[in-house]
């Protein structure tokens, strides 16, 4: 992988057309990975939603700048603009339908933004988590948009997703991150979050004006915008259809500030496990910052090997962390991490200057990964291949990860997910009985206790054993689902079990029948 700064200066239509031609192969690879993440049966079931949503968005296009850019880029990619809008719509649909279709949940970008006051100025650090290992991290890009009559924008993305502004720098002197937020609403008359961000950034002359632009829009689903300016002001806005929540801070008074995917207000029911997962990751980072020595912040945030055995909590970086960027607005410097599979502290860091956009400087060369990092990267590849339906290769990488992993808590986690995969794919009861005995010996950390109890019950029901677990052993929010699984007819139970969808990177096992 190599991060490249791509200038888009002058005629934006011609630039995007030529960019599309160059990125055609990468886009189709990206599209294959995302559609491979979706099971064929479920994909057919919500395919009409995607297409109708894309058509609705295109009807609204008029002469908007965003759609002109999409059309030019799509022409270069060799696809109809509606096909690219269908691709974008997957992220919106995932935000809403992820509870029903577990495969979609894997499309949601996980995020961590760390804002700090340092001797070098005010710093914005960002981790991007996405199930796009082998795509995003193979072709990371910094796109520099310089269009007449509009403010200059630098966005961090990858080939095939140039118009999607997950992480940007505005030339008035502010940085902006988009974070997905769990929510329950789907606003059919809303605009794509990417259109809202794209047009708002190119229209607004400042951070305050950008926030005002956000207020004029209705989103399809729930997202968060996190912004920082040269004075250390940090603004946070959650947008959910026409509703918006807002908070403001100043790093001179409140540093550091850590944000993940937790809503600013009104945590939605049904997402308790995910919210707790985000909270633990924030706690890990806060503790890590308190013990910081002379370590680059991006290395600190991806230092996954630094995990306690007792009172274990998940690090802020995950098995799907594919992007890591640091922005120093005052100095006009951008640092990015580059590495294979999930990023870790041993991976290299490169610097780009906003003043000299041809300069790419090595800040820290790649180091030899330790045993933990090797196992971590193997586990990230396991989930990636699982998402693509390559079960044999996925299982191979997960076995490798478990065999190599030196950390006791993570060994138990990986053993547990091996049991989940075996439960999903093994039909022979004798073989499954061996897996069940292995499962009963596993001592998973607290975030997986509920799922361990669920899997014990599922194994016992599938094997026709007396139940050794009870609904009272799982969290109150899951007790009704637990009881339901114990009591439904066997044919329905069997169908549900086929649809289980494990996601190692957020320590969860999704079930389509769990609402």
Short names for language-model regions:
Residues 60-194, 217-225:
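A contiguous strand-loop segment
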Residues 429-431:
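Structural signature of tandem alpha-helical TPR/SEL1-like repeats
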């Amino acid at each position: 992988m190599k991060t490249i700064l791509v200038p888009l200066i002058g005629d934006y239509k011609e630039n995007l057309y030529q960019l599309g031609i160059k990125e055609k192969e990468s886009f189709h690879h990206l599209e294959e990975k995302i559609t491979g993440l979706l099971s064929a049966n479920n994909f057919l079931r919500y395919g009409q939603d995607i297409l109708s949503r894309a058509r609705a968005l295109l009807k609204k296009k008029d002469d908007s700048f965003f759609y002109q850019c999409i059309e030019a880029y799509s022409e270069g990619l060799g696809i109809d603009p509606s096909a690219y809008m269908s691709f974008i719509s997957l992220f919106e649909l995932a935000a809403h339908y992820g509870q029903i279709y577990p495969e979609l949940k894997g499309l949601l970008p996980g995020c961590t933004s760390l804002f700090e006051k340092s001797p070098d100025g005010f710093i914005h650090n960002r981790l991007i988590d996405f199930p796009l290992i082998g795509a995003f991290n193979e072709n990371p890009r910094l796109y520099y948009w310089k269009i007449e009559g509009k403010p200059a924008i630098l966005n961090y993305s990858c080939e095939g997703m140039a118009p999607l502004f997950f992480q940007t720098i505005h030339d008035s002197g502010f940085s902006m991150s988009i974070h997905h937020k769990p929510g329950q609403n789907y606003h059919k008359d809303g605009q794509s979050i990417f259109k809202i961000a794209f047009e708002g950034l190119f229209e607004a002359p400042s951070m305050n004006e950008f926030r005002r632009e956000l207020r004029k829009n209705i989103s399809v689903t729930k997202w968060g915008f996190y912004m920082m300016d040269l004075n250390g002001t940090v603004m946070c806005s959650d947008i959910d259809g026409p509703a918006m929540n807002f908070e403001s801070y100043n790093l001179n008074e409140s540093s550091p500030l850590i944000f993940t995917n937790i809503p600013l207000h009104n945590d939605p029911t049904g997402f308790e496990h995910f919210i707790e997962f985000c909270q633990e990751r924030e706690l890990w980072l806060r503790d890590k910052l308190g013990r910081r020595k002379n370590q680059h912040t991006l290395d600190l945030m991806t230092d996954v090997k630094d995990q306690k055995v007792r009172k274990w909590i998940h690090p802020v970086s995950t098995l799907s962390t594919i992007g890591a960027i640091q922005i120093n607005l005052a100095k006009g410097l951008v640092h990015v991490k580059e590495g294979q599979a999930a990023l870790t502290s041993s991976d290299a860091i490169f610097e780009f200057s906003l003043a000299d956009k041809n300069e790419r400087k090595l800040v820290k060369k790649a180091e030899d990964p330790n045993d933990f990092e090797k196992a971590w990267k193997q586990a990230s590849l396991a989930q990636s291949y699982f998402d693509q339906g390559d079960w044999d290769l996925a299982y191979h990488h997960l076995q490798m990860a478990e065999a190599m992993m030196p950390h006791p808590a993570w060994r138990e986690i990986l053993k547990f997910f091996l049991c989940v995969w075996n439960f999903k794919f093994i039909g022979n009861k004798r073989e499954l009985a061996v897996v069940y005995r292995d499962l009963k010996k596993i001592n998973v950390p607290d975030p997986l206790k509920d799922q361990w109890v669920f899997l014990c019950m599922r194994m016992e029901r599938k094997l026709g054993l007396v139940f050794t677990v009870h609904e009272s052993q799982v969290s109150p929010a899951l007790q009704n689902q637990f009881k339901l699984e114990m009591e439904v007819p066997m044919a329905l139970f069997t169908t549900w079990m086929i649809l289980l969808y494990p996601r190692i990177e957020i320590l969860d096992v999704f079930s389509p029948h769990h609402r």
